[in-house]
């Protein structure tokens, strides 16, 4: 989307001899600095990944471009970054580009951490995309974006220790068990990204009452408080809330 009135700069990249340009908009939201990559042909569509039935045929190009443009912008800003964090196959090419295309730059020493939210979504595509996107073109196999990140990211994580262990074996690994096993020492599970030293019902200051596995009485008091706050009818039935 075009963000009128925001600061922006032009970013140009090369993908296997093809030149691409985009605008990167910079803004702050609740004190957090945000950079948004704008490219009308790639991203101004009704849906982000598919037409409702099938993935867009140019998805490999769209998201390889996004990854390399984001890295090029990061290089141009001359800021010091602690980590580059990618999520799922859409950012997987970034791990390869960082190690291979940005070697020798100020970004080269920045570690790339890759989070797998659903290992079934891998974006497997024909071998010719390796040449077109300049992703290990010497390899004569299909291009698997997720597998590329498993190979080149410095550290891997996923949504829980249980899911991490499941991905070590088929069929949950969806064909990539060997890669997960090879990176086992660098692969951790972080339960929903939640820090239980802070978000714990036994000590959370935002709750009306505290509770834990050994003393659950406070849970009923919390339910009573939210029912009153939302002006709901008080019943003995469970309270379900969806976000």
Region annotations inferred by a language model:
Residues 1-243:
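Catalytic cores of nucleotide-sugar-dependent glycosyltransferases that transfer UDP/GDP/TDP-activated
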